[in-house]
Amino acid sequence: MAGSTYGLDKIAGVQGYLVVNPDGAVLASSGDLENDEKTAGVIVDMLQTASMIPLSGDSSHSLKRLSVHFGNFVLMATVTNQRIFIVKRPTTETE
């Protein structure tokens, strides 16, 4: 997919990434997650569901990051500036 990599290709050990808008549309992608609209949709749904859970009594606190751990990799999603950045990395011994 053409466009900026948003610097995600510089993350150590990255196996793939997605940049998604809040509606789930893929804006940029690479590697194992190249054009993976299904994963994008699932992560957006998970973020929307998780954001409904109050984290504290202070309404200014909101969900900013979500990690989904699998056997040999982790998907990490960060929400910022109306974009969702999803990165796939291998798990390590400490995770």
UniProtKB/Swiss-Prot annotation:
Principal subcellular localization: other
UniProt entry keywords in alphabetical sequence: Lysosome
InterPro entries the record matches: LAMTOR4
A GO biological-process term: cellular response to amino acid stimulus
Protein origin, superkingdom: Eukaryota
GO CC terms: lysosome; Ragulator complex
Cellular compartments annotated: Lysosome
Quaternary structure and partners: Part of the Ragulator complex.
Its job: Regulator of the TOR pathway, a signaling cascade that promotes cell growth in response to growth factors, energy levels, and amino acids. As part of the Ragulator complex, may activate the TOR signaling cascade in response to amino acids.
Name of the protein this chain belongs to: Ragulator complex protein LAMTOR4 homolog
Organism of derivation: Nematostella vectensis (Starlet sea anemone)
